[in-house]
Amino acid sequence: MSMGWMEAGFLGLLQGLTEFLPVSSSAHLRIAGEFLPSGADPGAAFTAITQIGTEMAVLVYFWSDIMRIAAAWLRQNLRLGEYNKADARLGWLIIVGSVPIVFLGLFFKDAIEHSLRNLYITAVMLIVFGIVLGLADRIGEKRYKLNQLIWRDGILFGFAQAMALIPGVSRSGGTISAGLLLGYTREAAARYSFLLAVPAVFGSGFYQLFKSIGEDNPVGWGQTGLATLIAFIVGYAVIVVFLKLVSTKSYMPFVWYRVVIGFILLALLGTGVISAGG
């Protein structure tokens, strides 16, 4: 059964709500697919394409930051005069930090699109990396600002982001956990997480988009477009609220949410209510 408009709209809403929260949007889309009337995993391609919508929200929200970083990076490399060294370095770190997820994404492409979408793996990753986030939030020193980001840490952020190729890890959850463990403030870790995602998510989304042109799309292009638009609108609202919350609030509600959802998923799998797939 093909996916209907209401289902696609719901998945777009879910993508927008969960992409920037440390709860794994890919896990939520993977799980939700099992309960929809069409009863199917929307697939890695649908997930990647709808993420273009949420990353457009990042571009809009962080436009002035991105332009400032890009200008400093260009002025440094084209020797156009004075530039902000911290912004130029951040530009390089976003580029270098994107390398791990690109390399590993291409190397493990088949596993990412098939075997790693097994819901048992998703459930375990939700629990394990939820606990990691909780520990990071508790023991992290939270003293460094984004303009203090160094090369070593920027690259470690990149490897943490690459872990999110496994549904259940969470791209933002992995990078935020890494940032907290490295001593960065909650807001600094979250902001760099959002900026670091731009090249990787756009790259993955447009790769899947162009790859899918001319092929049979099990979801439907109209439905995919609707989901992407909804993901953009909802994602922007989530960024606004989330960045206000993380400056003063703990990540523990997200930790408990991940752990509970992970165990519920294991129970549903164990009792045969849903199949693991993958």
Swiss-Prot record:
<dbReference type="GO" id="GO:0071555">
    <property type="term" value="P:cell wall organization"/>
</dbReference>
<comment type="function">
    <text>Catalyzes the dephosphorylation of undecaprenyl diphosphate (UPP). Confers resistance to bacitracin.</text>
</comment>
<keyword id="KW-1133">Transmembrane helix</keyword>
<feature type="transmembrane region" description="Helical">
    <location>
        <begin position="149"/>
        <end position="169"/>
    </location>
</feature>
<keyword id="KW-1003">Cell membrane</keyword>
<dbReference type="InterPro" id="IPR003824">
    <property type="entry name" value="UppP"/>
</dbReference>
<keyword id="KW-0812">Transmembrane</keyword>
<dbReference type="GO" id="GO:0005886">
    <property type="term" value="C:plasma membrane"/>
</dbReference>
<protein>
    <recommendedName>
        <fullName>Undecaprenyl-diphosphatase 2</fullName>
        <ecNumber>3.6.1.27</ecNumber>
    </recommendedName>
</protein>
<keyword id="KW-0961">Cell wall biogenesis/degradation</keyword>
<comment type="similarity">
    <text>Belongs to the UppP family.</text>
</comment>
<keyword id="KW-0378">Hydrolase</keyword>
<feature type="transmembrane region" description="Helical">
    <location>
        <begin position="43"/>
        <end position="63"/>
    </location>
</feature>
<feature type="transmembrane region" description="Helical">
    <location>
        <begin position="88"/>
        <end position="108"/>
    </location>
</feature>
<dbReference type="GO" id="GO:0008360">
    <property type="term" value="P:regulation of cell shape"/>
</dbReference>
<feature type="transmembrane region" description="Helical">
    <location>
        <begin position="119"/>
        <end position="139"/>
    </location>
</feature>
<feature type="transmembrane region" description="Helical">
    <location>
        <begin position="194"/>
        <end position="214"/>
    </location>
</feature>
<dbReference type="GO" id="GO:0009252">
    <property type="term" value="P:peptidoglycan biosynthetic process"/>
</dbReference>
<dbReference type="GO" id="GO:0050380">
    <property type="term" value="F:undecaprenyl-diphosphatase activity"/>
</dbReference>
<keyword id="KW-0133">Cell shape</keyword>
<feature type="transmembrane region" description="Helical">
    <location>
        <begin position="254"/>
        <end position="274"/>
    </location>
</feature>
<dbReference type="GO" id="GO:0046677">
    <property type="term" value="P:response to antibiotic"/>
</dbReference>
<keyword id="KW-0046">Antibiotic resistance</keyword>
<dbReference type="Pfam" id="PF02673">
    <property type="entry name" value="BacA"/>
</dbReference>
<feature type="transmembrane region" description="Helical">
    <location>
        <begin position="226"/>
        <end position="246"/>
    </location>
</feature>
<keyword id="KW-0997">Cell inner membrane</keyword>
<keyword id="KW-0573">Peptidoglycan synthesis</keyword>
<keyword id="KW-0472">Membrane</keyword>
